[in-house]
Design a protein with these regions (language model features):
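Conserved catalytic core of sirtuin-type NAD+-dependent deacylases
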Residues: 1-151
Length: 151
């Protein structure tokens, strides 16, 4: 890899499972406990925003109990090494956790959103939040009630 200057790596559930993050599709995974259409679709959010907020509150709470593993840290070190010699590493992840960032990676793209981010369904403003949310919360930008949803 000494001649490679710009690398893109795709990661998925396996990298964070080692840290103790529940996967969605494995036996006993989250989709066995919560039907995807109820907690991870616009229709599910419209039908029962409280259920969706509670699901993501549970996921954020679980995230507070885990740490990045050796793979997250190794990718962050690779990124730093490439950057030092004028290169770059982009991590594209299917994961909604922030373990790549906690491990030190900076150039991370989350394909399916991120647990620690909210999106206002009215004005489109995004912001970081590690706290529990509810359907009664207001957007920090437009102040509209019931605006924030998981990103």
């Amino acid at each position: 890899m000494s001649k490679l200057n710009h690398i893109v790596i795709l990661t998925g559930a396996g990298i964070s499972a080692e840290s103790g993050i529940d996967t969605f599709r494995s036996e006993g995974g989250l989709w066995e406990q919560y039907p995807i259409e109820q907690v991870a679709t616009p229709e599910g959010f419209a039908a029962d925003p409280a259920l969706v907020h509670n699901f993501y509150n549970m996921r954020r709470a679980a995230l507070k109990t885990v740490k990045p593993n050796a793979a997250h840290i190794a990718l962050a070190e690779l990124e730093k090494g490439l950057h030092a010699r004028g290169g770059s590493l982009t991590i594209i992840t299917q994961n909604v956790d922030n373990l790549h960032e906690q491990g030190g990676a900076e150039n991370v793209i989350h394909m399916h959103g991120i647990l620690t981010s909210l999106l206002c369904q009215f004005c489109g403003h995004r912001w970081e939040s590690h706290e529990d949310t509810s359907p009664d919360d207001s957007c920090i930008a437009c102040q509209r009630r019931s605006g924030p949803r998981p990103d």
